[in-house]
UniProtKB/Swiss-Prot annotation:
PROSITE patterns xrefs: PROTEIN_KINASE_ATP (PS00107), PROTEIN_KINASE_DOM (PS50011)
Originating organism: Aspergillus fumigatus (strain CBS 144.89 / FGSC A1163 / CEA10) (Neosartorya fumigata)
GO cellular component: cytoplasm; nucleus
EC id: 2.7.11.1
Family: Belongs to the protein kinase superfamily. CMGC Ser/Thr protein kinase family.
Protein name as annotated: Serine/threonine protein kinase AFUB_078980
Enzyme class: transferase
């Protein structure tokens, strides 16, 4: 061992002791009102690990506050007592099934690549299992991220990304998609912004519901400080629905972002993500969804969604429909729409409200390269990265 390494080991910081959590003077919420993960349609309290603020996992990760939740997990802001840094800890519900997200993240960790898009994909630090009252739970440790693009957008006035920021985000997203296909879009930041969350629980304890077996906390998401403008590259994250391989079957994607081939029961490839990018642009830039897809009762309807696609994109190509197992529910053998739903009077161009002239024309050409009925006609991520509108200053 060199003298330098002996010296660095001598000066290495010892692990920090766990902090004593707040045990009083926090807001108690009405036990009859459902909050957070309780509001998920298939919520089962017994499936979630009963995390408490102050808990320490693996003898090193102390829980400081709750960041968020989903149908299958909760996410916690933690202090790494060994390496004196902040991390995000995702704790999954109890399940006997192999966790798809863990599989994908392990695969990512094993990939050796110099592709620039790999740095734009969120990687896990480590994964482990813990045992709860009703079984085992898988856990993933990540670097914490500041916020999602959509939450960042909500802080803007008006609530739409400026064109230059949209272009930058799309370039990074497409570069990451060229390396790996995913859905969630988040903004990354350095460690300094997290320091005030370290002590925020002491200054303003999280509201919570408490009973003898389980405490449910209100999330404390990160927010930009007033006047703070420092943020890093957007990262792709959340691989819970990611797939390994090239061709798949089955239903995927949230209703309003679902690609035509998925709706019509066809096999699908990475081109479903290109469709997602095209649809997501409206959320980020136009401040509204491109498609609605709801019937008169407010519930999702594939027929209404397909009718909107016809209005926005034009008629579906006959050669595409002939490959779609479920197309005869909505079209006749000649490709004429026979759905009971009338095609609405709207267009893709009319739904874009901010651009004008040649710039709008170029933007619409860019979008139409992604929003194509036939996935084989959608451009790939590398092709889209050279689009004239995207690279124009």
């Amino acid at each position: 061992m060199t003298p330098f390494h002996r010296l660095s080991r001598f000066f290495r910081q010892a692990p920090s002791p766990p902090r004593t959590p707040i045990t009083s003077n926090f807001p108690i919420l009405d036990s009859a009102v459902k909050i957070e993960e309780e509001r998920m349609p298939a919520f089962d309290r017994g499936l979630f690990y009963p995390v408490k603020l102050g808990d320490v996992f693996r003898s090193r990760y102390q829980v400081l506050s709750k960041l968020g939740f989903g149908a299958n997990s909760t996410v916690w802001f933690c202090r790494d007592l060994h390496q004196h840094r902040y991390i995000a800890l995702k704790i999954y519900i109890r399940s006997s099934e192999v966790n798809r997200e863990v599989q994908v993240l392990k695969h990512l960790s094993s990939v050796k690549t110099n592709h620039p898009g790999s740095s734009l994909v969120r990687k896990m630090i480590e994964e482990f299992e813990i045992t709860g009252p009703s079984g085992s739970h898988q856990c993933i440790v990540y670097e914490p991220l500041l916020t999602s693009l959509l939450h960042f957008q909500a802080t803007l006035k008006p609530q739409s990304l400026p064109e230059d920021l949209l272009k930058g985000a799309l370039q990074q997203l497409l570069l990451a998609l060229d390396y790996l296909h995913s859905e969630a879009h988040v903004i990354h930041t350095d460690d300094s912004i997290f320091r005030e969350w370290d002590t925020s629980e002491e200054a303003e304890p999280s509201p919570r519901k408490v009973d003898s077996s389980h405490t449910i906390y209100k999330s404390r998401p990160f927010h930009r400080k007033k006047g703070w403008s420092g943020f890093g590259m957007p990262l792709l994250s959340d691989f819970g629905e990611a797939r390994l391989g090239d061709v798949h079957d089955g239903s995927i994607q949230p209703d309003i972002y679902r690609a035509p081939e998925v709706i019509l029961g066809m096999s699908w490839t990475s081109k479903v993500d290109i469709w997602n990018v095209g649809a997501l642009i409206w959320d980020l830039f136009e401040d509204h969804h491109l498609f609605d897809g709801r019937g008169p009762n407010g519930d999702h309807s594939d027929a209404h969604l397909l009718a909107e696609m016809i209005a926005m994109l034009g008629p579906a190509p006959l050669n595409f429909l002939r490959k779609a197992p479920q197309s005869r529910k909505y079209w006749d053998s000649n490709g004429r729409w026979k759905g009971a739903i009338e095609v609405p009077q709207c267009s893709l161009e009319d739904s874009e409200e901010y651009l004008e002239g040649e710039n709008k024309k170029m933007f619409m050409q860019f979008v139409r390269k992604m929003l194509r009925w036939d996935p084989e006609e959608r451009q790939s991520a590398p092709e889209l990265l050279t689009d004239p509108w995207l690279i124009a200053q």
